[in-house]
Amino acid sequence: AKFKIDSISVGKSESTINLSSADVGQYGVVYVSYTLTSNPNIPNSGTWTGYGRGISPEGVLARGDLMGVWTMDGTKINVKSVDSVTDGINFLSGTIDLAAREMEAEIFKVE
């Protein structure tokens, strides 16, 4: 799925990235917020928490509590997460490109 960065709020040791996508499969239009916190012991990495909301073309609302880890390489943030979503558990692997203002992500159901 392709997401665009809508906004970023920057803090001293954490930043929040707000993203949206026009089409994430059965979830339809999706909005997510990721709050990334730096790990002071490991440079260019940390943990993150977030929340997601999706609305399908049929009007079905999906909600998700998201959490994972991140690493940074240049302008790119690599994220991995295990997410508790309305219809079960998902695994996400993605790359946020700060220069291009977008994220590419793959989302898989955890059985």
Regions picked out by a protein language model, each given a short descriptive name:
Residues A1-E111:
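Beta-strand-enriched cores of mature, soluble protein domains
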